[in-house]
């Protein structure tokens, strides 16, 4: 008897329908066709043991499994459960009546228990688009899949539950999540707040400007000056995630398998801080079977690269294009995968190898050449893509001893949200553009053209600092953001002056 089970394959952050056809023939082997990977081919032994351990009889015949369409690579052990159910249906142990109404996915242990899978959320979205009645999957993934409306999600722990449900012997309890209620309730829960930061008013201001316009920022300062501490507080002043952003962010983490069991919706912006020993594949994504890298896991959030010059030069260079395109394309021989990568880059570095150049009390032992060589580990094109470069000085004793709390993250966030609202209105007719940092060159000329005094100020700065054309655009974008924070319609000279002040590494005398 031929049975058909509905499953799914994840491509990028979306899912594609896979039909698993199972039939029995003479002999005693298992044949799986349809471009399966090694894990899928190995499922035959897991399925055999799981069926027998669950109290059913594995058919003493050749089991032929066809996974269509055949041109899509089937990866991972998530096909164990649908293959097992298809096998039992072909052997007339499971009634086939309900198989066309449910998507079934799950990895099987040898005892028949069902283990978690990757990509449950995009699969659930596909099941709804296919107008299926429900989605049967591991209980550990039920919460993330249940955020999809108009779809019944059934989390199971054991294959026997699925068999009894499909045979009409038991009713499974659907997992229900009130997505909007959970999204609203979880907003604004941050472990760190800028009110805890002593001093550093100029750095706080730079962070406010960066968040208001979605700009990348570099912090240059000695060890212990508070670079990492302040970077951790950055998500607390970014605008809240919209529901659509939260869904997209959760999809990426679902595909990567980084969601904790029981997680429904990611409601705060991601903050990723990879170690400087990270490989290019781990940073941008890829591998034999592509999966999202750190830049995609930071989508709609913050990617913090601490001690930037310590990263391998190759690692940093592969990040240049995603910074511009806000997505990463991974090409393989037979297919291409795209992952979103619209993140805010926050980088930090010491000013020199010893770390104390410019320190008010500790002498630097590096030569000017050593300082220049240290910076040269970061390419010019990458530095050009960082809009704000701010020097972080150590906090003095009086500021440390001051018990008066600083301005709260909530107060800063309100100004950031107001500036972003101005930008949303400005770019309402420009698809894919949401903030000043994303403006094209023509948009910069249209929306960020300074007044005559500001233009002359910018001309002098460009000529003296020998800046690139990209740096010119960056200054105007930052100046536009500063004007938005003030509620100013036009970009004036004081906005240009402040924006130029955030180009620390462009100063010719910075390294002595």
Residue ranges and their predicted role:
Residues 33, 39-44, 59, 66-76, ...:
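Basic, amphipathic alpha-helical bundle interface domains used for macromolecular binding and assembly
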Residues 221, 285, 307:
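The Walker A (P-loop) glycine that initiates the GxxxxGKT/S ATP-binding motif of P-loop NTPases
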Residues 170-209, 213, 240-295:
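P-loop NTPase nucleotide-binding/switch module
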Residues 300, 306-307, 318:
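Walker B catalytic acidic pair
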Residues 110, 303-304, 310-311:
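Residues immediately C-terminal
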Residues 1-218, 222-228, 331, 471-472, ...:
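Peripheral, non-AAA+ core regions of ATP-driven protein-machinery
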Residues 219-260, 325:
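Walker A/P-loop
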């Amino acid at each position: 008897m031929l049975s058909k089970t509905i499953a799914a394959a994840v491509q990028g952050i979306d899912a594609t329908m896979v039909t698993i056809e199972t039939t029995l023939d003479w002999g005693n082997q298992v044949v799986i066709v349809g471009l399966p990977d090694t894990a899928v081919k190995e499922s035959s032994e897991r399925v055999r043991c799981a069926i027998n351990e669950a109290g059913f009889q594995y058919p003493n015949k050749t089991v032929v499994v066809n996974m269509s369409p055949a041109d899509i690579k089937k990866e991972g052990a998530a096909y164990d459960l649908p293959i097992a159910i298809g096998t039992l249906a072909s052997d007339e142990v499971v009634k086939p009546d309900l198989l066309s109404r449910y998507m079934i996915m799950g990895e099987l242990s040898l005892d028949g228990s069902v283990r978690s899978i990757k990509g449950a959320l995009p699969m659930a979205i596909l099941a709804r688009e296919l107008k299926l009645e429900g989605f049967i999957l591991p209980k550990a993934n039920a919460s993330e899949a249940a955020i999809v409306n108009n779809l019944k999600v059934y989390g199971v722990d054991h294959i026997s539950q699925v068999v009894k449900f499909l045979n009409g012997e038991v009713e499974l309890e659907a997992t229900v999540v009130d997505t909007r209620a959970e999204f609203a309730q979880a907003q604004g829960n941050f472990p760190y707040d800028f009110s805890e930061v002593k001093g550093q008013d100029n750095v706080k201001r730079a962070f406010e400007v960066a968040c208001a316009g979605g700009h990348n920022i570099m912090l240059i300062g000695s060890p212990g000056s508070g670079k990492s501490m302040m970077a951790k507080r950055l998500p607390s002043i970014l605008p809240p995630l919209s529901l659509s952003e939260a869904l997209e962010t959760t999809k990426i983490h679902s595909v990567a398998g980084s969601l904790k069991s029981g997680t429904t919706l990611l409601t705060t912006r991601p903050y990723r801080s990879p170690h400087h020993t990270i490989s290019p594949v781990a940073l941008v994504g890829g591998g034999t079977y592509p999966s999202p890298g750190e830049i995609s896991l930071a989508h709609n959030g913050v990617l913090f690269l601490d001690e930037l010059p310590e990263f391998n030069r190759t690692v940093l260079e592969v990040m240049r294009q995603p910074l511009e395109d806000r997505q990463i394309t991974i090409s393989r021989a037979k297919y291409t995968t795209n992952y979103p990568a619209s993140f805010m880059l926050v980088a930090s570095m010491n000013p020199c190898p010893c770390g104390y150049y410019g320190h008010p009390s500790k002498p630097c032992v590096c030569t000017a050449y050593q300082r220049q060589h240290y910076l040269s580990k970061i390419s010019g094109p990458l530095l050009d893509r960082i809009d704000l470069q701010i020097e972080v000085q150590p906090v003095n004793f009086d500021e440390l001893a001051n018990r008066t709390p600083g301005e709260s993250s909530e107060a800063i966030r309100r100004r950031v949200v107001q500036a972003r609202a101005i930008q949303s209105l400005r770019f309402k007719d420009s698809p894919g553009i949401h903030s000043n940092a994303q403006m094209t060159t023509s948009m910069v000329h249209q929306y960020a053209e300074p007044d005559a005094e500001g233009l002359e100020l910018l001309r002098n700065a460009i000529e003296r600092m020998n800046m690139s054309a990209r740096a010119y655009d960056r200054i105007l974008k930052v100046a536009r953001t500063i004007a938005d924070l003030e509620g100013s319609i036009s970009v004036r000279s004081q906005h240009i002056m402040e924006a130029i002040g955030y180009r620390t590494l462009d100063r010719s005398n910075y390294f002595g």
